[in-house]
Amino acid sequence: MKQPKIPVKMLTTLTILMVFLCVGSYLLSPKWQAVRAEYQRQRDPLHQFASQQTPEAQLQALQDKIRANPQNSEQWALLGEYYLWQNDYSNSLLAYRQALQLRGENAELYAALATVLYYQASQHMTAQTRAMIDKALALDSNEITALMLLASDAFMQANYAQAIELWQKVMDLNSPRVNRTQLVESINMAKLLQRRLD
């Protein structure tokens, strides 16, 4: 007995159908979706700066460090700085005050508190802000942040001579915390505006 021959066309169609079914089921599987997501992530030119750099991740990391060691004033200060950059002045003040309570009298922390208060008051020098600056400068007459805040406020009030004097003092300190190029530009701008007033 001869077995019936399956036509070649039918065999080809069945083979193609099988291939499509296999590929289709693979493409619908979760494994393929994970591979595809990873491929797209790798193609993103910013993939190296992924989620660990997001503000939420930074905040979570800082909070985890503080939970692990709540007596670390440095981490509290970093938390204050984080909130300042997020324009969350209330939480920034709380964090900086906690850092100050843990560390004790500290010029940098008083200057940081002054900065938060200054921006919270829409860049106006309040009595409370001035008190924090005075405390910072009493502890360290060369405290960069306090001097820069005074210079910026003088500039905002069109007291260009005072701004130039303070910025020059900061420049003469040769601190690595200072962007000298930006400082020179600020001094030159103040000089230009001063000449216009004269």
Curated annotation (Swiss-Prot):
<comment type="function">
    <text>Required for formate-dependent nitrite reduction. Not required for the biosynthesis of any of the c-type cytochromes nor for the secretion of the periplasmic cytochromes.</text>
</comment>
<feature type="repeat" description="TPR 1">
    <location>
        <begin position="73"/>
        <end position="106"/>
    </location>
</feature>
<dbReference type="InterPro" id="IPR011990">
    <property type="entry name" value="TPR-like_helical_dom_sf"/>
</dbReference>
<keyword id="KW-0677">Repeat</keyword>
<keyword id="KW-0802">TPR repeat</keyword>
<protein>
    <recommendedName>
        <fullName>Formate-dependent nitrite reductase complex subunit NrfG</fullName>
    </recommendedName>
</protein>
<feature type="repeat" description="TPR 2">
    <location>
        <begin position="144"/>
        <end position="177"/>
    </location>
</feature>
<dbReference type="InterPro" id="IPR019734">
    <property type="entry name" value="TPR_rpt"/>
</dbReference>
<dbReference type="Pfam" id="PF23914">
    <property type="entry name" value="TPR_CcmH_CycH"/>
</dbReference>
<dbReference type="InterPro" id="IPR056413">
    <property type="entry name" value="TPR_CcmH_CycH"/>
</dbReference>
<dbReference type="InterPro" id="IPR051263">
    <property type="entry name" value="C-type_cytochrome_biogenesis"/>
</dbReference>
